[in-house]
Regions:
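Short, small-residue-biased leader/transition segments that mark boundaries at the very start
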Residues: 2-4
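Glycine-rich adenosine-cofactor-binding loop
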Residues: 40-43, 50, 59-78
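Phosphate-coordination loops involved in phosphoryl transfer and adenosine-cofactor binding
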Residues: 57-60, 133
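Active-site capping/gating segments
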Residues: 48, 157-181
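Glycine/small-residue-rich loop that forms an oxyanion/phosphate-binding "nest" at active or ligand-binding sites
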Residues: 7-57
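Rossmann-like adenosine-cofactor binding region
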Residues: 91-160
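NAD(P)-binding Rossmann-fold cofactor-contacting core
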Residues: 79-94
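Active-site glycine-rich loop that binds ribose-phosphate moieties when present
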Residues: 45-56, 68-71, 90-95, 122
C-alpha cells in the first residue's frame, strides 16, 4: 500500500478494481494467481468513514482538491452531485469556497492544506456557509485534529478526521491482501 494514491503504477498492472479504474489511481496492489491487481481504497474508505461516524451524507458535496484522493472522493459521492474547488481545473476556485459551501451538505478536504509541513487553509470562514448538520471530512491524518476539523467541530458540524480514512483503508487493504472479511467500525 502507499499513502498517496498514484496513477503511474497503473500501466504496470494486469487488472484494476472498478474503484481504481474510475478514480484513475491505485494505492493497494495485490498479487493474484500470477497477476497484479490494483485497488483504490480511498473511495470505499471515504464512504465507510462517513458511515462509521454515523454521517449519512445527503445533498451536494464540495470536494476541495483535484488529485487522486479528490477523484476518489468525487467518485464516492458522485450520486450527490459534486462541486470541485481547486487552484487549477476545479468547478470553483478556492476564493469561491463560501459561495460553493452554501450549496452543499458535505465537504471533503483532499488537499495537503493543514497537513504537517504544509500551509494551513488561508481562511476557514467558508464553514459558516454550511447548513446545520453538514459533514466535514478532512482526509489529513497528521496532525490528527487539523484546524479544519477543529473549526468544523466548533461550529457544531459533523467533523471527521483523516485517521478515520486511514483506519478504513487499512481494513480494506487487509481484506484485499488476505481475503478476510474484517468489519469496518469507527475509530
Amino acid at each position: 500500500t502507499c499513502a498517496l494514491p498514484i496513477w503511474q503504477v497503473i500501466r504496470y498492472l494486469d487488472q484494476l478494481s472498478p474503484e481504481a479504474e474510475a478514480c484513475g489511481a491505485v494505492n493497494t496492489v495485490c498479487f493474484r494467481n500470477g497477476h497484479t491487481v490494483g485497488y483504490n481504497t480511498d473511495a470505499p474508505g471515504i464512504r465507510a468513514g462517513f458511515a462509521a461516524r454515523g454521517a449519512s451524507p445527503t445533498g451536494r458535496a464540495l470536494v476541495i482538491g483535484n488529485g487522486g484522493a479528490a477523484r476518489a472522493a468525487r467518485w464516492a459521492l458522485a450520486d450527490r452531485g459534486v462541486i470541485t474547488a481547486a487552484r487549477r481545473g476545479g468547478d470553483v476556485t478556492m476564493d469561491q469556497l463560501p459561495q460553493a459551501a452554501r450549496q452543499c451538505r458535505v465537504v471533503v478536504n483532499a488537499t495537503p492544506l493543514g497537513m504537517e509541513g504544509f500551509p494551513p487553509f488561508a481562511d476557514l470562514s467558508f464553514l459558516d456557509s454550511l447548513p446545520a448538520g453538514a459533514a466535514v471530512f478532512d482526509l489529513i491524518y497528521a496532525p490528527r485534529k487539523t484546524e479544519l476539523y477543529q473549526a468544523a467541530r466548533a461550529r457544531g458540524l459533523i467533523a471527521i478526521t483523516g485517521m478515520e480514512l486511514l483506519v478504513q483503508q487499512a481494513i480494506l487493504a487487509f481484506n484485499h491482501f488476505t481475503g478476510a472479511g474484517l468489519e469496518q467500525e469507527a475509530t
